[in-house]
């Protein structure tokens, strides 16, 4: 991401070197800080997150309504952050089970989109990895940070109803390719 897209330095809240604890931790470039004492450079890189695209035999997309901020009350797709030592495929499968009660039996990578995600007042930059997921079972159980789950015919899905920017853009992209996935 070019430097001009940042409104302020992404590490402005980080005042101490994570390696040695020094407060001589200054801006190195548009996405990193460098310690003036030990020389450590800390880069601000995106966090991996996954998004599940689940389409049933009626060409309906499984959507969730967010129960928590950010974008509480808006539509979303199942998914979330990957855990350490977890593959993206394992992460999307775990998130689908946590949020819907469904078991994923197959995943296929579709595409990725960058996103900004506000968590506890801090702007996280994520790389959202979209996966087509085939699931077992039909009983939907909204849980974790999901208020409601429902199936919407793909042709009726409106990108603007999705609260997170990357999900809305992903829906736009899906609507152009969903007949081929």
Locations of the language-model features?
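Nudix hydrolase/Nudix homology domain
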Residues: 1-13, 139-181
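Short linker/helix segments within small regulatory modules
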Residues: 26-32
């Amino acid at each position: 991401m070019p430097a001009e897209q940042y409104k302020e330095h992404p590490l402005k809240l980080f005042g101490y070197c994570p390696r040695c604890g020094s407060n001589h931790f200054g801006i190195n470039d548009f996405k990193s800080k460098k310690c003036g004492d030990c020389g450590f450079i800390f880069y601000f890189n995106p966090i991996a997150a996954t998004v599940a695209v689940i389409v049933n035999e009626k060409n309906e997309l499984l959507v969730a309504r967010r129960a928590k901020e950010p974008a509480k009350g808006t539509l979303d797709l199942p998914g979330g952050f990957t855990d350490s030592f977890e593959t993206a495929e394992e992460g999307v499968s775990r998130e689908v089970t946590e949020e819907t009660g469904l078991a994923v039996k197959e995943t296929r990578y579709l595409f990725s989109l960058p996103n900004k995600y506000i968590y506890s007042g801090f702007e996280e930059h994520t790389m959202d990895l979209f996966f087509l997921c085939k699931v077992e079972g039909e009983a939907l159980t909204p849980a974790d940070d999901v208020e409601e789950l429902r199936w919407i015919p793909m042709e009726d899905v409106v990108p603007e109803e999705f609260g997170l920017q990357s999900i809305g853009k992903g829906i736009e992209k899906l609507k152009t390719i969903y007949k081929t996935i």
